[in-house]
Amino acid sequence: MMDLLHCFATNVRYYRLKQKYSQEHLAELAGLHRTYISALERERRNISIENIERIANALGIEPYQLFMEGSDTDV
């Protein structure tokens, strides 16, 4: 079983790359800073529910999808 932070970080990166977004572009769309997205993907930051929603909206997905294990997340 994957821990929640690892699952979230893996899925953010997967969906970001699937959309062909850079960390900077995702950050702009979500109204966040690029270093924050980078830290999330490296599991160095915790995240608020508000920012989960902002990232999901920027990626065009539902927030719950960022916590689903076993998606095609091998990037």
Where are these regions (language model features)?
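Short basic helix-loop element that most often maps to the first helix and adjoining turn
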Residues: T10-H25, L29
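Conserved hydrophobic/aromatic packing and binding residues within compact polymer-binding modules
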Residues: V12, L26-A27, I37-L40, L66
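Residues within helix-turn-helix
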Residues: E24, T35, E53
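Recognition helix of helix-turn-helix/homeodomain-like DNA-binding domains
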Residues: L32-N46
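Short, basic-rich loop-to-helix N-cap that marks the start of a DNA-contacting helix
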Residues: R44-R54
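Hydrophobic micro-packing sites on short alpha-helices
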Residues: I52-A56, L66-F67
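Short, charged recognition helix plus adjacent turn
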Residues: Q65-V75
